[in-house]
């Protein structure tokens, strides 16, 4: 049986069915407990980061090495012909695709990853974040952690806190969880950084419950997952950043009435939105979350490059 993700571009979480999402999570769980150090032996994968990244890039490159593949690429767009010589993204991808078996791309411009698919031929493109648009591999690792801690992806109460306007992680995660039944969302953000209307309209179209709040404490007792985000300084003007950066800070006293099963996730980096004392509580799961990113990215690479990998 051919796996449905073989040679598929991974650009948006919306491009994946619930069955495909579950396939990635199942393979990730398998690889976590049964490493396959030669699964991608002799494969070469390009890591093309036109925008700064630490966790995503290192997580992907660790995943590549642990599967036995080789990695080539760059972490600074200013060192490339695209920047120095004016080469187009189309030409860059057209050339790189002749060298490698898959291309991982992060780019500051929305839509860049999908544009890359038009010039990569049969080489799959994996979107590692395009502007404020999508970050599907982060979403997959978020889903993995939710399933690992809650044992399900449906009938959950999930709060998303902080920068919901520019935070591509919360956009992608909400769209992924829409594919599973009976989830209830709580959006906690200042008015200037609320969830985009297109996400809210999608929730309404699917008859999914959501509510908007300005108070973190009032919803914590109801939650299974508390998804914190930082206010993204690089996407705001300085005045707006100063006004909102510390408006929603999770303190240890907020957790006094939390459910025993509740877990705190964060895509990282953290600035000051989670007090360091919270790290020592059983609710904190963001460092385990980051570690699990290696397994979910291993699973995704394994699936797009292995025709018959289904379990």
From Swiss-Prot:
Binding sites annotated in the UniProt record for carbamoyl phosphate: 55-56, 106, 135, 138, 268-269
This protein's record includes keyword Transferase: yes
Recorded metabolic or biological pathway in which this protein acts: Pyrimidine metabolism; UMP biosynthesis via de novo pathway; (S)-dihydroorotate from bicarbonate: step 2/3
Origin superkingdom: Bacteria
A single cellular component GO annotation: cytosol
Matching PROSITE patterns: CARBAMOYLTRANSFERASE
The enzyme's E.C. designation: 2.1.3.2
MF terms (GO), sorted A to Z: amino acid binding; aspartate carbamoyltransferase activity
Keywords: Pyrimidine biosynthesis, Transferase
Described purpose of this protein according to its UniProt entry: Catalyzes the condensation of carbamoyl phosphate and aspartate to form carbamoyl aspartate and inorganic phosphate, the committed step in the de novo pyrimidine nucleotide biosynthesis pathway.
Protein name: Aspartate carbamoyltransferase catalytic subunit
């Amino acid at each position: 049986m051919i796996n449905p993700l073989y040679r598929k571009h991974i650009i948006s979480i919306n491009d994946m069915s619930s069955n495909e999402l579950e396939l990635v999570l199942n393979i990730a769980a398998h690889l976590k407990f049964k490493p396959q150090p030669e699964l991608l032996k002799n494969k070469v994968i390009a890591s093309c980061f036109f925008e700064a990244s630490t966790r995503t890039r290192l997580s992907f490159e660790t995943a590549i090495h642990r599967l036995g593949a080789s990695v080539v690429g760059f972490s600074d767009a200013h060192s490339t012909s695209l920047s120095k010589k004016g080469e187009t993204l189309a030409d860059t991808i057209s050339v790189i695709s002749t060298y490698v078996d898959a291309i991982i791309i992060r780019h500051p411009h929305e839509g860049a990853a999908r544009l890359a698919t038009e010039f990569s031929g049969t080489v799959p493109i994996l979107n590692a974040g395009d502007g404020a648009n999508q970050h599907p591999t982060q979403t997959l690792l978020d889903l993995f952690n939710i399933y690992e801690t809650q044992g399900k992806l449906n009938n959950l109460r999930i709060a998303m806190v902080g920068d919901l306007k520019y935070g591509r992680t919360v956009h992608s995660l909400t769209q992924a969880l829409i594919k599973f039944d009976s989830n209830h969302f709580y959006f906690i953000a200042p008015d200037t950084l609320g969830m985009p209307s297109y996400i809210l309209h999608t929730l309404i179209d699917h008859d999914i419950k959501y509510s908007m709040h300005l108070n973190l404490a009032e919803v914590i007792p109801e939650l299974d997952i508390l998804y914190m985000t930082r206010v993204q300084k690089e996407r705001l003007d300085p005045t707006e950043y100063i006004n909102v950066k510390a408006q929603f800070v999770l303190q240890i006293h907020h957790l006094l009435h939390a459910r025993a099963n509740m877990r705190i996730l964060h895509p990282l980096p953290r600035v000051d939105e989670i007090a360091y004392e919270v790290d020592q509580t059983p609710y904190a799961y963001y460092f385990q979350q980051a570690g699990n990113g290696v397994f979910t990215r291993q699973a995704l690479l394994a699936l797009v490059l292995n025709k018959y990998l289904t379990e």
